[in-house]
Every structure is written in structure tokens, then in C-alpha cells.
Amino acid sequence: MNIENKEITSSWFTNLRDLLCKEFEKIEEEYAQTKGLKPAKFVRSSWQRNGGGGGVMSLMKGAVFEKVGVNISTVFGKISPEFRNEIPGAELDGKFFATGISLVAHLKSPLIPAMHFNTRYIETSKSWFGGGGDLTPFYPEKNETVKFHAAFKEVCDKYDSSYYPKFKKQCDEYFYLKHRKEPRGVGGIFYDYLNNGNFEQDFAFTQDVGKTLLSVYPEIVRSKLFLPWTAEQKEYQLIRRGRYVEFNLLYDRGTKFGLMTDGNVEAILMSLPPEVKFN
């Protein structure tokens, strides 16, 4: 396993975490100032994994972000024998290293889309990058969806013109609730097992995906920050959040990987909404 690659990827995810938290706190502050409220701040808690490594959870519950979590983790060790065949390159000895960042934002306003983003670097006897970002609006708007996709298409095209159509398709297929026969949201990009034989290029792409999210999502949030909403719209948001819960518990690879590698359960389930209704 390449020690330098581990260090620079882990360092980047920590840096991106700091940038995201700072930007989201800034949005909370902008809103709080106009409403005479005390702005919310992220609360951090660290955890250690028994088999090796650990992570830091950053959680904020505010007036804009009902619940937003930004987690970073770097874990290593051996995967249990019963799960080794599910992780490429871990079949023989089970050794693995994984570092990454994950973000899930659930907004108080039903007019502002929920956001999911993660990027990661994993080593077994093989190595690869994965990640992506997807938007889940409760009241979709075409212009907003187009803008979101255009931002990720631009970063994809910078590296390979085949990336965006491929990663968009993978996102559409991945974030699909088979039992309901419906998509979770309006998509985005999703990639996994990315290894083109050029670590620097794959890493640069993964960094740019993070920078794109840092730019496009706060802009979407700010555009609807002060729009009024109704009790009926809030009720609909709570019901639709149930789809988020269903996907994360039934299909999400990150949830499964975290549980298979004895990760922190609270951090793994951070993606679940703070309030939800099932009718």
C-alpha cells in the first residue's frame, strides 16, 4: 500500500471538510442575522475504530440546515472473511485502507433540496477512487436541476468527455428505489472503482468534484433562503424523506461498507433525516 497516496488523500478530505463546514456556517449566519437568531455552529466528535483508524463527525442543527453532517474517516485493517468477496482485491487476506468524506444535508425549508455527496479513496490489493453528488428536491425546478448537472458536466468534461454521460447514468441507476420503481431525486454523478493507471489525474478529478459541490450547492441554498413555505409543503417534505431512509437502509453501498468494516454506527447513519413521516 502506498503511504504517500494515503496521506495526501486523507489530508484533502480533511481540508474539504473544513471548507464545507465554514461555508454552511456562513449561510446559517447570513440567515440568523436577518431573523435576530443566534447562528448555529458545527459540533465535532471523534471516534476510533477497534480494528484501526477512526474519524470525525461534524454535525450542525440550525435554522437553515435542519440537520447537516460532514464526516471524514480513515480506517484500515482486515475485513471479516464473510465480507471479503464483496470488496475488490480483499479476497485473499482481507487487508484494506479507506479514507473519505461524506456529506448529507437536510434543510428545514421544503423548497430547498436535500444534498448527498461523498468522495473516497480505497486500497486493498487494488486501489481506486469513488464518489459523487446528487440532489433531492421535494419540489423540483428544471432550471435548478439543469444548473446542478451543468456544473458536474463541466468538471467531468475537463478530464474525459465520456465521464459525464457514464457517471450520470450510473447515478440514475444507483439512486433508484427498485421496490417503489422511482428515482430518489434528480440525480447528479456517481462513480466507483475509478483507476485509470494515473493516480494524480484520478485524485485531481476527485478533488475537483468536491470543489464543484462546494460552489454549486451553497448557491442553490442561498437562492431560496428567504422563500416562504406552507405547513402542507413541510408535511410533503417529511413524507418524501421516507424515501431517503428506505434507500440508505436498503441499498446504500457506503452504509453497507461501513457496517462490514465495523465503522462508527452513528457516523454511518448520520445520513438519516432528523424527522420523517411514514403514512
From Swiss-Prot:
Keywords: Cytoplasm, Heme biosynthesis, Metal-binding, Oxidoreductase, Porphyrin biosynthesis. Homodimer. GO terms for biological process: protoporphyrinogen IX biosynthetic process. The active site is at 116 (proton donor). Pathway: Porphyrin-containing compound metabolism; protoporphyrin-IX biosynthesis; protoporphyrinogen-IX from coproporphyrinogen-III (O2 route): step 1/1. This is Oxygen-dependent coproporphyrinogen-III oxidase. Pfam families: Coprogen_oxidas. A divalent metal cation binds at residues 106, 116, 149, 179. The lineage of its organism: Bacteria, Pseudomonadati, Pseudomonadota, Alphaproteobacteria, Rickettsiales. It is found in: Cytoplasm. Substrate binds at residues 102, 118-120.
